[in-house]
A protein has these predicted regions:
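N-terminal low-structure segments adjacent to metalloprotease catalytic domains
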Residues: 1-61, 66-67
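Protein maturation boundaries and topogenic segments
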Residues: 72-74
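Mature, structured domains enriched in cysteine- and short glycine motifs
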Residues: 106-120
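Catalytic Zn2+-binding segment of zinc metalloproteases
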Residues: 146-166
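Short loop/turn hinge sites at secondary-structure boundaries
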Residues: 32, 36, 44, 54-59, ...
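Metalloprotease/metallohydrolase-associated module, dominated by Zn2+-dependent proteases
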Residues: 2, 10-17, 21, 25, ...
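Active-site surface patch of divalent metal-dependent phosphodiester/phosphate bond hydrolases
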Residues: 69, 104, 139
């Protein structure tokens, strides 16, 4: 159970965060709205239609951010869910060791008694900056879910459909480990070229490797470091 003071602190943090984040959210929406499909005869018609549909589908999610729906949702749920908690000191240190200053771990909440979904399906999910699960959550799963928090901070609520589409894609969570990373690096690809669930597993596997003290893990982690630069260099507020 959380104290009332924790609830009040949570609401205060969310309001301050939303106000500070608003200019960035407006900028995201405007950039998205002025995007125009570049008509070029080298593009096939079905590709233009698909890209245009994705553009239209994304508009509501950018609007959701501007009208503070993520914060309204989290504050409302916080009033009804007394199992949510802030990260422990140990969890805060783990988060900072992986993400640096690219997330705000002191704002993250965990509900490890989330009945709707996690209890039946034994899975975790992220609603903006709240991690929902049922029972104990391992460190590796915590890191994976924190990637979705990071995605929300960097890209907005659009992370939700992108993560769902990633789960249903042919690749799913599979990024083909070191070989897949090397191939992407050779093509000058970055972390955002992977789908939103692959990103979570890449960071999670990097975290796992850092816990193992053997030569093979050290060698393999070098290519992961290249993509981890994207995690630690991206903004919280601009």
């Amino acid at each position: 159970m959380n104290s009332l003071s924790d609830k009040i602190k949570f609401v205060y943090y969310r309001i301050i965060f939303a106000i500070r984040e608003l200019p960035v959210r407006i900028k995201r929406l405007l950039i998205h709205l002025i995007w125009i499909v570049p008509y070029d005869f080298k593009y096939k018609q079905h590709e233009i239609i698909k890209t245009g549909a994705e553009w239209l589908f994304g508009i509501p999610f950018y609007i959701i951010d501007v009208i503070f729906l993520p914060e309204i949702y989290e504050i409302t749920m916080e009033m009804f869910k007394w199992n949510t908690r802030f990260l422990t000191h140990r969890e805060l240190e783990l988060a900072r060791s992986v993400f640096g200053n690219s997330i705000l771990p002191e704002l993250v909440r965990i509900d490890n008694r989330s009945v709707s979904g996690p209890k039946q399906g034994r899975f975790a999910y992220v609603s903006f900056q709240t991690i929902n699960c049922y029972g104990h959550m391992s460190d590796r799963i915590l890191i994976h879910e924190l990637v979705h928090v990071w995605q929300f901070l960097q890209f907005g609520s659009i992370y939700i459909p992108k993560a769902i589409l990633a789960q249903r894609s042919k690749e799913g969570y599979n990024y083909f480990r070191t070989a897949g990373l090397m191939n992407m690096k050779l093509r000058n690809g970055r972390l955002y070229h992977f789908n939103f669930e692959q990103q979570g597993d890449i960071v999670m596997d990097y975290f796992n490797m850092k816990q193992v003290n053997d030569d093979q893990a050290i060698i393999e982690s070098e290519v992961y470091e290249y993509f981890m630069e994207d995690i630690k260099s991206m903004r919280i507020f601009s």
